[in-house]
Amino acid sequence: MKVMTLNFLTCAVKNCKSSNDSFPLHPKEAELAKDDIEINPQLLINVLPRIDWAALRTTSTELGFPTLPEQPPSPEDLQSDEALLKELHELLMETQMMEGKLVCGHCGHEYAVKNGVANFLLPSHLV
């Protein structure tokens, strides 16, 4: 599961739908893998407005990556700063969580991640 995907996931427990604490899910005991993918600046420029930057900063820190800037970079920043472009590409596109858990900040439910796939099936008492 790519780090970019984590930015779009929230807790599936019914009681968490109305809580801001259910997003982002927090990676725990994460085993990461890296795929070498050719950098596509236009893809990053197009995806960046859809990313919740505060959540990405949280996830990035929890996974042990360097702290991202307070504000998301503009398309011009990405085009002029090759190091930033490469750093974001590596984090969003190349880094995958292969094993571990995703934990809800509201209810504490843990979603197991195995072979890069998170199990979002809930027991009947949580639906």
From Swiss-Prot:
List cellular component terms (GO).
cytoplasm; eRF1 methyltransferase complex; nucleus; tRNA (m2G10) methyltransferase complex
Gene Ontology molecular function: any one:
protein heterodimerization activity
Q: Which cysteines are joined by disulfide bonds?
A: none
Residues forming the TRM112 domain are 2-123
Gene Ontology annotations of biological process type:
maturation of LSU-rRNA; maturation of SSU-rRNA; positive regulation of rRNA processing; rRNA (guanine-N7)-methylation; tRNA methylation; tRNA wobble uridine modification
**InterPro entries named among the record's database cross-references:** Trm112, Trm112-like
Has keyword Nucleus? Answer: yes
Which keywords are on file for this protein?
Cytoplasm, Nucleus
Presence of keyword Nucleus: yes
Location in the cell reads:
Cytoplasm; Nucleus
User: What Pfam families does the entry give?
Assistant: Trm112p
Q: Which family does it belong to?
A: Belongs to the TRM112 family.
Purpose: Acts as an activator of both rRNA/tRNA and protein methyltransferases. Together with methyltransferase mtq2, required for the methylation of eRF1 on 'Gln-182'. Together with methyltransferase trm11, required for the formation of 2-methylguanosine at position 10 (m2G10) in tRNA. Together with methyltransferase bud23, required for the formation of a 7-methylguanine in 18S rRNA. Involved in biogenesis of both 40S and 60S ribosomal subunits.
Subunit architecture: Heterodimer of mtq2-rmt-1/trm112, forming the eRF1 methyltransferase. Rmt-1/trm112 is necessary for the solubility and activity of the catalytic subunit mtq2. Interacts with trm11; required for full tRNA methyltransferase activity. Interacts with bud23; required for full rRNA methyltransferase activity.
> What protein name does the entry list?
Multifunctional methyltransferase subunit trm112
**Organism (species):** Neurospora crassa (strain ATCC 24698 / 74-OR23-1A / CBS 708.71 / DSM 1257 / FGSC 987)
